[in-house]
């Protein structure tokens, strides 16, 4: 609790730095120098942070707060070490994920990581430059990134259920999907408490339509799906038509599908009804592509928030930049990761607020450049559209909070979001590395539990624990 409070205090102070950092004279950045050591399933150790601040005392305050923030969002602290393994999952060979038995289930990792980080100048009384006053060279960042992202997702092949179940990241995908299911379900319920019918949703970066069934189960009335990749949009629309045409199908929402770059194009100009308002905008594993420049990030937020009704929500998942930078600074090179995922930065020590590019690769499924998202900056920018941050948790914090609910726990089992450990005689574990399951083996020895346990391998947990969930509410 103390760590959480400290993290919130740090972010409030950091917002002022974020405002002052973006100026027209030089690129804004913040510098972090950490000495950390690998420990257990994650990274831990004492952190030293160097920032440009006006006094040594304030710098020390920021250092201490960032240490707290890093430890709370990392997976290496002693109190968090067991993470997912205590959850018990019986073997259910015929269980599928929440997305149903359709052969066109969502390829969970069409959605990709993102981040958040630390800030530069700490002088709050210094001139406070408006966020719009971004350096000219930020405005002239190289063209082509958006088309590269679109091309990458257009080239991804649809994979059937059988092949997907054999993937090294099968449980990782299902776990990420469970996180989204719980997040979407929770905020649909909040909307339903305010209005009983005619719920309208904008799915920003819908991919191939992996969340369609979630919206159907949420009994919404209208869905607008947008994505930068035209092939993905066509597959999403086909998946919707397949759902609609099933003989046993219940009522399904109406939908429209738009191919557009939400960071460069104004979506209301493409809506059938430009006056349409939304109750929820969902942006899952997408925000980070927009932080190439201020203009792109602002356009993404405008598209996400401008047409939200008062009391509506902007929800999503995005990488935790504090965690990304912490792991980077702990690495001896400009990259970090394991056999499942890799993150490679261009250099260490200088992390601009916009255009801080890194390459992310996930098991051959995702391989595309992304940009850090400094969350206090995202929070500050969202205020322009009358949005208030009402929820923010790391994936670990979110899991530990939501798994206490029996419905969520049953959904976790149905979706096969955790791997049964130990494997039975007719199956094998997804990882051949013994140390990938040391945490589960240790838990078995120290606790009287019903077997098999449900867990993620160490490698999978390292990959998924770079994310956080968030929700903003539109104010009156």
From Swiss-Prot:
Name the Enzyme Commission number(s) assigned to this protein.
2.1.1.56
- Span(s) of short sequence motif Nuclear localization signal: 126-128
Q: Record the organism.
A: Macaca fascicularis
Under the heading PANTHER family, the entry gives:
MRNA CAP GUANINE-N7 METHYLTRANSFERASE, MRNA GUANINE-7- METHYLTRANSFERASE
Q: Name one GO biological process term.
A: 7-methylguanosine mRNA capping
Top-rank taxon, per record? Eukaryota
Upper classification of the source organism reads: Eukaryota, Metazoa, Chordata, Craniata, Vertebrata
Q: Which residues carry this modification: Phosphoserine?
A: 24, 28-29, 118
Give the positions of the site mRNA cap binding.
Answer: 208, 214, 239, 288, 370, 467
According to its UniProt record, where is this protein located? Nucleus
Name this protein carries in UniProt: mRNA cap guanine-N(7) methyltransferase
**What does the entry list as the binding residues for mRNA?**
176-177
Name the top EC class: transferase
Report the protein's function. Answer: Catalytic subunit of the mRNA-capping methyltransferase RNMT:RAMAC complex that methylates the N7 position of the added guanosine to the 5'-cap structure of mRNAs. Binds RNA containing 5'-terminal GpppC.
Instruction: Kindly name one Pfam family recorded for this protein.
Output: mRNA_G-N7_MeTrfase
Annotated residues that bind S-adenosyl-L-methionine are located at 180, 205, 227, 261, 284, 289
Predominant place of localization: nucleus
Family note: Belongs to the class I-like SAM-binding methyltransferase superfamily. mRNA cap 0 methyltransferase family.
Give a yes or no for keyword Calcium in this entry.
no
> What GO molecular function terms would the record report?
mRNA 5'-cap (guanine-N7-)-methyltransferase activity; RNA binding
